[in-house]
UniProtKB/Swiss-Prot annotation:
UniProt family annotation: Belongs to the thiamine-phosphate synthase family.
GO BP terms: thiamine biosynthetic process; thiamine diphosphate biosynthetic process
EC numbers, comma separated: 2.5.1.3
Protein name in UniProt: Thiamine-phosphate synthase
Binding site for Mg(2+): 72, 91
Recorded name of the encoding gene: thiE
Length: 211
């Protein structure tokens, strides 16, 4: 059975934002603050390190009621028994991912505009990550910012919940939620925060109030 998931506050990891802090500690604090969906995004780790880190995170977040999805790497997700996989437009096709992971794991897909949101209709995915909403330096190949209006159009086209990503902060989170987003995907707003738990708690409150 596919796990229930709460996309209200979705942490996307970036060890480059941690200023030397331990990733598991930051993730644990963020989950304690209300991030109930976590994506492990590791572009530089070797496969063995990736699997070991993913396995440790599964053991950390699952007892706390959160879910872990793996960015891009279906093999890593299966090896560590993660809750799902998140893919981008240049990764494996969603139908192929679904065939590998089966019906009982989560599958997310990134979309960067209306055309991709429209093309995602009918795909076997559980949610879309839409953005960047605002200009971001976290992901160099993120594409042009779509703004609130672009987000609204992507949400209107979607058949599944849409999580907004791309320089979403406490200052603009309410507007993002008011646009109809199912949740906020955060990278630096939590990973780079001096107190990840407090940052997550503040963002969680804003997200829930913004619905």
């Amino acid at each position: 059975m596919k796990p229930n998931f709460d996309p209200t506050l979705y942490l996307v990891t970036d060890r480059g934002c941690l200023a030397g802090r331990d990733l598991l500690d930051v993730v644990g604090r963020a989950v304690a603050g209300g991030a109930k969906l976590v994506q492990l995004r590791e572009k530089n780790a070797c496969t063995r390190e990736f699997v070991e880190l993913a396995r440790a995170l599964v053991g950390l977040v699952r007892p706390l009621g959160a879910r872990l999805v793996i960015n891009d790497r279906v093999d890593v997700a299966l090896a560590c028994d993660a809750d799902g996989v998140h893919v981008g437009q240049d990764d494996m096709r969603p139908a192929d991912v679904r065939a590998l992971i089966g019906p009982d794991r989560l599958l997310g897909l990134s979309v960067t505009g209306e055309d991709e949101a429209r093309a995602a209709r009918g795909e076997p995915v559980d949610y879309l990550g839409a953005g960047p909403v605002f200009a971001t330096a976290t992901k160099k190949d993120a594409g042009a910012p779509q703004g609130i209006e672009g987000l609204i159009r992507m949400i209107a086209l979607a058949e599944v919940p849409v999580v907004a990503i791309g320089a979403v902060t406490a200052a603009n989170a309410a507007a993002v939620m008011a646009a109809g987003a199912a949740g906020l995907a955060m990278v630096s707003a939590i990973c780079a925060a001096p107190d990840p738990e407090a940052a997550a708690r503040e963002l969680r409150v804003i997200a829930e109030q913004g619905r």
